[in-house]
């Protein structure tokens, strides 16, 4: 079942999109009037931002300080799991050269060592 917050967001977007017909905008207005234009639900984006903030705090608690190369770039610190996943994917991707796989393995080991 579609997320109610996404449905509301879609109708709001339709109202502000100059490429949407007046007929479609009227349907969007009607839907928002009947169902409310505000929602107590959160969209995936909001959940993602909260998760990023939680992850950053958790990384700091685990000892990731300014000495860590990933802490210098806050977005990388927040997404350490994505960084690790990228290295793992490169190690198992048949289109990546052997040299690239070795390099990914070295970087993954470095990341794992720094997270201890």
From Swiss-Prot:
GO terms for cellular component: cytoplasm; cytosol; nucleus. Its main location: cytoplasm. Residues 39-48 have a biased composition (Polar residues). The keyword Nucleus applies. It is found in: Cytoplasm; Nucleus. The keyword Cytoplasm applies. Keywords: Cytoplasm, Nucleus. Residues 49-64 have a biased composition (Basic and acidic residues). Residues 32-116 are annotated as: Disordered. Belongs to the UPF0654 (con-6) family. This is UPF0654 protein C869.09. It comes from Schizosaccharomyces pombe (strain 972 / ATCC 24843) (Fission yeast).
């Amino acid at each position: 079942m579609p997320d109610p917050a996404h449905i509301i967001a879609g109708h709001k977007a339709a109202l502000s999109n100059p490429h949407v017909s007046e007929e479609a905008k009227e349907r969007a207005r009607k839907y928002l009037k009947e169902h409310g234009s505000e929602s107590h639900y959160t969209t995936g984006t909001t959940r993602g931002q909260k998760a990023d903030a939680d992850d950053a705090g958790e990384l700091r608690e685990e000892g990731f300080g300014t000495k860590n190369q990933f802490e210098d770039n806050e977005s990388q610190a927040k997404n350490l799991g994505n960084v690790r996943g990228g290295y793992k994917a490169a190690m198992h991707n048949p289109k990546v050269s052997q040299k690239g796989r070795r390099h990914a393995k070295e970087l993954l080991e470095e990341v794992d060592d720094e997270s201890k």
